[in-house]
Amino acid sequence: MADTGSFIHLARPLGPATVGVAPSTAPLNVVIQPQAIFSILDHSLRRNADQERVIGTLLGTRSEDGTEVEIRTCFAVGHTETTDQVEVDMEYQKQMLALHLKANPKEVLVGWYATSSELNTFSALIQNFYGGQGDGTWPHPAVHLTVSTEPGKDIETRTYISAPVGVTAERAADSAAFIPVPYEIRYSEAERNGLEAIAQARDAEDRASSLFTDIETLEKSIEEVLGMIDRVSKYVESVIDEEAPASTALGQFLLNALALAPKVDPADIESDFNKHIQDVLVVSYLANTIRTQMELSNRLATAQLTLGGGDSTAIGGTGAESGGQRGGQRNNRQRGGQQRNQAEELRA
């Protein structure tokens, strides 16, 4: 999460005033979903070798008062960029935007992204297009998201909005003042666990990672908490011994964290923890029992189908044999009748 205390919020007129429409001037906070970042990184990996950056459109939701924007999805937009000019496939952008809005009616256009931290004249030109009237985000500000994708370096993410600067009318289209705004990458507990499981396969030779059981997950969580407590204890001891500089903000954060701890006896905590362990064991036992029962049911069903097919074959064979016997008896009776007729003719 970005440090929200290092940002200043300014009033931001985004263009010429329209009758009955006023631009939003409230502070803005941006929430980014992880799937949007992954889509941007995937787009960066598929870019041409001669492209320094790629761009695309950001879609998401906006709060009723316009003070919070949530970036949920995005799609790539083709463009060519040289030292003298930039060309963006706006027709493709409009068609894809209409298609996405038709599939997700609750989402709206919120801005655009680029895989470069550099802000230049071309960035201002694209920003003014996305924040303009008609097909843009007017009267709300267009959010510009930059994601650095340099190999071997950490991924840096920044968010901006823009405001016009005092230039001539001829330079208004490619001029803008980019203002940083706070942001946060918000993800659920399930998404975090999934990402951790995927990250564990990074160093494996077969690129595979096994899922943890409930007991293993609980053990890992306890180890992480103990590790964090150990780091905090070492930091506090180093500050007390004047080996490390003190931080008022960090001290206030630790004080607030300790204030949230419930004031209960250690014996009660141990009792509750043991009960939780028992609950986890019961759930794990029931899950294994259900899994075993399902496997047994599948095996019984397979065996029943196999035995049922054999019985049908045997019954069919018995029927054929009995039919053959009946046919043979009829033939014997016919031959016996013929012999009696011949004997009577001879006597006559």
UniProtKB/Swiss-Prot annotation:
Subunit structure: Component of the eukaryotic translation initiation factor 3 (eIF-3) complex.
GO cellular component terms attached to this protein's record: eukaryotic 43S preinitiation complex; eukaryotic 48S preinitiation complex; eukaryotic translation initiation factor 3 complex, eIF3m
Main location: cytoplasm
InterPro entries membership: eIF3f, EIF3F/CSN6-like_C, JAMM/MPN+_dom, MPN
Region ranges (Disordered): 312-348
Annotated PROSITE patterns: MPN
Molecular function GO terms recorded: metallopeptidase activity; translation initiation factor activity; translation initiation factor binding
Job description of the protein: Component of the eukaryotic translation initiation factor 3 (eIF-3) complex, which is involved in protein synthesis of a specialized repertoire of mRNAs and, together with other initiation factors, stimulates binding of mRNA and methionyl-tRNAi to the 40S ribosome. The eIF-3 complex specifically targets and initiates translation of a subset of mRNAs involved in cell proliferation.
SMART domains linked to this entry: JAB_MPN
GO biological process, one term: formation of cytoplasmic translation initiation complex
Sorted UniProt keywords: Cytoplasm, Initiation factor, Protein biosynthesis
Family annotation (Pfam families): JAB (PF01398), MitMem_reg (PF13012)
Compositionally biased region (Low complexity): 328-341
PANTHER family: EUKARYOTIC TRANSLATION INITIATION FACTOR 3 SUBUNIT F, EUKARYOTIC TRANSLATION INITIATION FACTOR 3 SUBUNIT F-RELATED
MPN domain sequence ranges: 30-166
Source organism, top-level taxon: Eukaryota
Record protein name field: Eukaryotic translation initiation factor 3 subunit F
Keyword Nucleus in annotation: no
Localization per record: Cytoplasm
Compositionally biased residues, Gly residues: 312-327
